[in-house]
Amino acid sequence: MKKEVVVIGGGIVGLSCAYSMHKLGHKVCVIEKNDGANGTSFGNAGLISAFKKAPLSCPGVVLDTLKLMLKNQAPLKFHFGLNLKLYQWILKFVKSANAKSTHRTMALFERYGWLSIDMYHQMLKDGMDFWYKEDGLLMIYTLEESFEKKLKTCDNSGAYKILSAKETKEYMPVVNDNICGSVLLTENAHVDPGEVMHSLQEYLQNVGVEFLYNEEVIDFEFKNNLIEGVITHKEKIQAETIILATGANPTLIKKTKNDFLMMGAKGYSITFKMPEELKPKTSSLFADIFMAMTPRRDTVRITSKLELNTNNALIDKEQIANMKKNLAAFTQPFEMKDAIEWCGFRPLTPNDIPYLGYDKRYKNLIHATGLGWLGITFGPAIGKIIANLSQDGANEKNADIMLFSAFFRD
């Protein structure tokens, strides 16, 4: 079976690549090992949080994380063991936690955040129907020290709105008196990731993109400097261009003789109903404990915790209990009705810079992975970048790849 473009992976990055490649007139086939109904992209917080928000690795994060570990509130949990890559990842994470690297990354976040928002607008114009709100991201601070630190970065550009603890309750009625205040980052937005995924799937199917669900790619056939065949557990597929967007699963990446500095970070979310009068008015992030709380049509979702160096795909009830406990410290008592607990693995690089671009060996292979917790934020932008790259034909001819790919970042 021969295809023009094969996208391996049906998450937000894979679907966004399929969307933009189709827009260029290509015939696209998406291969997804599951049924496409509940992957990692579905469990995302839904934040489009590219603006005025630092990456995970930033100045002070190491000491802050150690302090939070003592209180069981740290955003990262490390399962230490005999895994050299974990220690390489941690070393790179620590090295990236400096002002110069953070400044550059935040500038890139802004550039590609606007591109993602443009792409979401295009999707809505194309008739897709999903929850999309451009009403800012409320950064809630529970430590006076970090609140004061954030206030020093705010300017009069209109991108920031500084709120007292009392004013914060107008946006986040559920908070209690244990908060210090908040900053509304006005340029940010949020979506319901499940609705985005379903709408994008439906649109792509309607315009002729082929989907091979429940079909797992298990290997490749190589010939000289090309991938001659994509081998699934059902068939062999040939393709002119192959886009590898398999997220946190390193198996296929390793089969292409690559081993990216990327960890599968296990993240958690709880989706529930709560009293309408207490629901957040916009997407919110408890900055000091790295917990997002996002309103949707009928429900609210909290997301938190990233575990590194674990392959356990089961929900850790202790982690769920810690999330609830940490949230309860800063909110009024309320009942989480019809709660749905979830966990999934995100492809996390130590500096939040993804692996994008043509493979160094195989000329018809393009990589698109490593967005970690920022898949919904940058997925549509990555799809556009990859489509443009396919026209350029080489990494060095595409400025976005040179700027935003880990292949070209120290």
UniProtKB/Swiss-Prot annotation:
Q: Where does FAD bind?
A: G9, G10, G11, I12, V13, G14
Subcellular location(s) of the protein? Cell inner membrane
Q: How would you classify this enzyme at the top EC level? A: oxidoreductase
GO MF annotations, alphabetized: D-amino-acid dehydrogenase activity
What does the protein in this record do? Answer: Catalyzes the oxidative deamination of D-amino acids. Has broad substrate specificity; is mostly active on D-proline, and to a lesser extent, on several other D-amino acids such as D-alanine, D-phenylalanine and D-serine. Mediates electron transport from D-proline to coenzyme Q1 in vitro, and is involved in the electron transport chain from D-proline to the c-type cytochrome in vivo.
User: Transmembrane helix among the record's keywords?
Assistant: no
Q: Give the E.C. number(s).
A: 1.4.5.1
User: SUPFAM superfamilies, from UniProt?
Assistant: FAD/NAD(P)-binding domain
Task: State its cofactor.
Answer: FAD
Q: Which GO terms describe its cellular component?
A: cytoplasm; plasma membrane
Q: Which UniProt keywords apply?
A: Cell inner membrane, Cell membrane, Electron transport, FAD, Flavoprotein, Membrane, Oxidoreductase, Transport
Coiled-coil annotation reads none
| Record's bilayer topology term | Peripheral membrane protein
The record's comment on protein family reads: Belongs to the DadA oxidoreductase family.
Identify the domain of life.
Answer: Bacteria
Name of the molecule in the record: D-amino acid dehydrogenase
Q: Does the keyword Membrane apply?
A: yes
